[in-house]
């Protein structure tokens, strides 16, 4: 299915970008892309966003495996007839696997996208995180649109 190709594409872009950061930037260094808005910053994370559950790798391993099995099952069952759901789940699967690969092989996640939103210093993130968030937002939008159609 094309949705697995989307997941593989996310994994590839995520892992290549992280490899480039690890090979070419010292930990903690930043490259400004748009001053006061967007930076490429070499950062490592041993937990989730905002340092939640730091150094609890076993927890992330278990949760990710269960989550990936659920996503694959859900894709097989429901994505055949629903393109947007399939695309969303492909993005989520790719994002989950991208960070899982880091946790297994590096015991930490490589983050590098650093943004300031209205002067708020948002936690540094990566391509996998972005794919996960975009996938979730697409599912929320789809759910809201379907709810609106059902009311009409």
UniProtKB/Swiss-Prot annotation:
Major location (coarse): membrane
Superkingdom: Bacteria
Per UniProt, what is one GO molecular function of this protein?
A: aspartic-type endopeptidase activity
The UniProt entry lists membrane topology as:
Multi-pass membrane protein
Look up the EC number in the record and give it. 3.4.23.36
What GO terms in the biological process aspect are recorded for it?
proteolysis
Give the matching InterPro entries: Peptidase_A8
The catalysed reaction is: Release of signal peptides from bacterial membrane prolipoproteins. Hydrolyzes -Xaa-Yaa-Zaa-|-(S,diacylglyceryl)Cys-, in which Xaa is hydrophobic (preferably Leu), and Yaa (Ala or Ser) and Zaa (Gly or Ala) have small, neutral side chains
Quick check: keyword Transmembrane in the entry?
A: yes
Q: Where in the cell is it found?
A: Cell membrane
- Keywords, comma-separated and alphabetical: Aspartyl protease, Cell membrane, Hydrolase, Membrane, Protease, Transmembrane, Transmembrane helix
EC class? hydrolase
Question: What are the annotated GO cellular component locations?
Answer: plasma membrane
* UniProt pathway: Protein modification; lipoprotein biosynthesis (signal peptide cleavage)
- Looking at the UniProt entry, the stretches that span the membrane are 55-75, 85-105, 124-144
Keyword Lipoprotein applies: no
* Coiled-coil annotated residue ranges, if any: none
Residues of the active site are: 111, 129
The record's function comment reads:
This protein specifically catalyzes the removal of signal peptides from prolipoproteins.
The family classification in the record reads:
Belongs to the peptidase A8 family.
Name the record gives this protein: Lipoprotein signal peptidase
Q: Which organism is it from?
A: Bacillus cereus (strain B4264)
Gene encoding this polypeptide?
lspA
